[in-house]
A protein has these predicted regions:
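Helix-rich interaction surfaces within compact, conserved domain-sized segments
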Residues: 65-101
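Short amphipathic alpha-helical "recognition" segments used for binding
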Residues: 23-25, 50, 70
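Negatively charged, low-complexity tracts enriched in Asp/Glu with abundant Ser/Thr
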Residues: 1-34
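Generic, ordered loop/turn and secondary-structure boundary motif
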Residues: 12, 26, 44-45, 66
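Generic structural hydrophobic/aromatic packing signal, biased to beta-strands
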Residues: 23-25, 35-37, 60, 85
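A short, structured beta-strand/loop element
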Residues: 39-63
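Short, highly charged low-complexity linear segments
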Residues: 14, 49, 80-84
Length: 101
């Protein structure tokens, strides 16, 4: 038997307009990246980055790009592939905003 919606304890349930950039590129490693990069009012200005080919998504800001091994872990990349993705995302992610605290 399914759960009635009144049985859920929602932490939040909101809708908002977002902006999504779709981009596909290949670097020196010959790894093809097909990404959807979503900008939202959530996540302190970080971007929601989705690898469309593999169905993996991460919330990424400049601090995440500096975290050693993070992109390799999240997107299952080699070190060379992660370096290429980092080089691209450094141009995209911008700064983190803590305006909603």
């Amino acid at each position: 038997m399914g759960m009635d919606i009144s049985q859920f304890d929602f932490l939040y349930d909101t809708s908002e307009e977002t902006k999504t950039r779709f981009v596909s590129f290949i670097g020196d490693s010959m790894k093809r990246f097909d990404l959807a990069i979503t900008s939202s009012n959530r996540f302190y200005g970080k971007k929601l980055v989705t690898d469309i080919q593999h169905g993996k998504t991460a919330i990424i800001g400049p601090d995440d790009l500096e975290a050693e091994g993070y992109l390799e872990y999240v997107f299952k990349l080699t070190e060379e592939e992660a370096a290429e993705l980092t080089a691209f995302l450094e141009q995209v992610v911008g700064t983190v905003n803590f305006t909603d605290i």
